[in-house]
Regions:
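Gly/Gly-Pro- and Ser/Thr-rich, intrinsically disordered tail segments characteristic of DNA damage-repair
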Residues: 1-222, 226-228, 352-354, 359-362
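DNA-contacting surface of Y-family translesion DNA polymerases
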Residues: 5-7, 14, 188, 198-341, ...
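Extracellular/lumenal ectodomain signal focusing on beta-strand-rich modules
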Residues: 113, 341-343
Length: 362
C-alpha cells in the first residue's frame, strides 16, 4: 500500500461538497430529491439572486448568480427556497468532524470545502480507497454528495476537485498538468478572479499554460506578488501545508476605538466608522483574507454595550464594502444615545485564495 504514498512529499485531498446549500435542503426534505431546487436571497422578489442550485436545475440552464426571474423563465417548475445559514453551518461542522475521523490534518477553507493531508494514512488504504470511503460515508450518513481532488499539493487538489462534478474523484499529478491543467482557460484557475483574468487576456494570456510560460516580470507588473504566485502554481508548485489551525487564526479581524469624548453627532460617527472600516480593510489585506460576516459593536455613554452582526452571501474585503454594511448596522441599531466606543469586526474570515466568490444578494 505504501507505493501510493511518497517518501518525500504529500498526498493531499480537497473535499468539495456539491451544490451544498441545495443538497442540505434536499437531504432534510427527501421529497425534493430529483426536483430542480434553487436557493435564493428573496424568493418572493423577482430581483432575487440564485445563490446555488441543484444539478437538476442546472440541466435547465439555471446558474449561480442568475436573477430569479430569469431562472424561473428557464425552469417554471423551479423550487425556490430561502437560505438557512444556521443549518448549513451546523451540517458543515458535522462534515468536518467526519473528515477528522480519517486524519487530524483537516483544514476547512469555507463552509463546504476542506483540505486533508492523508500522507500518513497508508494503513487505511490507497488514496482512491480513502476518497471512495469518504464519499460513501457522506452519502450514507448525511445524504450529501462531494467531489474529491487527490494531488501532491493544495493547489492541484483544489483544481482536481473541480474537474468531475458531482460526486467525482480526480487524481492530478504534477506530470498531468501539461495535458489536464494547461489547456484550461485562465478563469478556471484557482486564484484568478474576473479582474485579473481581464488583465491577463489583454496580454494574450488565455489559458493556464500561458501563465506557466509567461514572463515573470510581466506577471508581477500586472498582478503584483499574486502574479508570481500564479506562475508557480501553474507550474504545479504549492508549498503551503494543510494547517488545521489556519481556520482558527482567521476567525475574526477587527478594529475598535474608544472616543476621548462621547459622540452623539451622526456625521462625526460616520467619519469614525469610515476610519475603522479602513483599518479593518488594511488588516484583511495584510493577511490576504476576506470575510462574510460583519459585526458592529456599540458602547454607549453608560457602558451599555450591544453587538449586531450581518451574515452576507458573498465575501468582502474592501473598505467601501466594510463601511457600507457597518453603516447599515449602525442605522438599524443605534438608539440615538451618545456613543463612547465603536468597533467593526469581520468574522468567519478566510484566506482570499481559499474561497469561492459569490455575487452579493443585496
Amino acid at each position: 500500500m505504501n507505493k501510493w504514498y511518497p517518501k518525500n512529499g504529500y498526498v493531499i485531498f480537497h473535499v468539495d461538497m456539491n451544490s451544498f446549500y441545495a443538497s442540505v435542503e434536499i437531504a432534510d426534505n427527501p421529497e425534493l430529491k430529483g426536483k430542480p431546487v434553487a436557493i435564493a436571497g428573496n424568493p418572493d422578489e423577482r430581483k432575487g439572486i440564485i445563490v446555488t442550485c441543484s444539478y437538476e436545475a442546472r440541466a435547465y440552464g439555471v446558474k449561480t448568480t442568475m436573477s430569479l426571474w430569469e431562472a424561473r423563465k428557464l425552469c417554471p417548475s423551479l423550487v425556490v427556497l430561502r437560505p438557512n445559514f444556521p443549518r448549513y453551518r451546523e451540517v458543515s461542522q458535522e462534515i468536518f468532524k467526519l473528515l477528522e475521523t480519517y486524519t487530524p490534518y483537516v483544514e476547512p477553507v469555507s463552509i463546504d470545502e476542506a483540505f486533508m493531508d492523508i500522507t500518513t494514512c497508508s494503513h487505511l488504504g490507497s488514496p482512491i480507497e480513502l476518497a471512495v470511503s469518504i464519499q460513501n460515508k457522506l452519502l450514507e450518513q448525511m445524504n450529501l454528495p462531494c467531489s474529491i481532488g487527490i494531488a501532491p499539493n493544495k493547489f492541484l487538489a483544489k483544481m482536481g476537485s473541480d474537474m468531475k462534478k458531482p460526486n467525482g474523484i480526480t487524481i492530478l499529478r504534477k506530470r498531468d498538468i501539461y495535458s489536464k491543467l494547461w489547456p484550461l482557460p485562465i478563469e478556471e484557475m484557482y486564484g484568478v478572479g474576473k479582474k485579473s483574468a481581464a488583465k491577463l487576456r489583454k496580454h494574450v494570456i488565455n489559458n493556464i499554460g500561458d501563465i506557466a510560460k509567461a514572463d515573470s516580470q510581466l506577471l508581477k507588473t500586472l498582478l503584483g506578488v499574486n502574479g508570481e504566485k500564479l506562475k508557480s502554481r501553474a507550474l504545479g508548485n504549492d508549498p503551503r501545508p494543510v494547517d488545521p489551525e489556519q481556520a482558527e487564526s482567521f476567525k475574526s479581524i477587527g478594529s475598535s476605538t474608544t472616543f476621548p469624548k462621547d459622540i452623539v453627532d451622526y456625521e462625526e460617527l460616520i467619519i469614525k466608522l469610515n476610519d475603522l472600516a479602513q483599518n479593518v480593510a488594511t488588516r484583511l489585506e495584510r493577511k490576504d483574507a476576506v470575510g462574510d460576516t460583519v459585526q458592529l459593536m456599540i458602547r454607549y455613554y453608560d457602558r451599555k454595550t450591544i453587538t449586531r452582526r450581518m451574515k452576507l452571501s458573498t465575501y468582502i474585503y474592501s473598505k467601501d464594502d466594510i463601511f457600507y454594511y457597518s453603516e447599515m448596522l449602525l442605522n438599524q441599531h443605534w438608539n440615538g444615545a451618545a456613543i463612547r466606543l465603536l468597533g467593526i469586526t469581520i468574522q468567519d474570515a478566510k484566506k482570499k485564495e481559499d474561497v469561492t466568490y459569490q455575487l452579493s444578494l443585496f
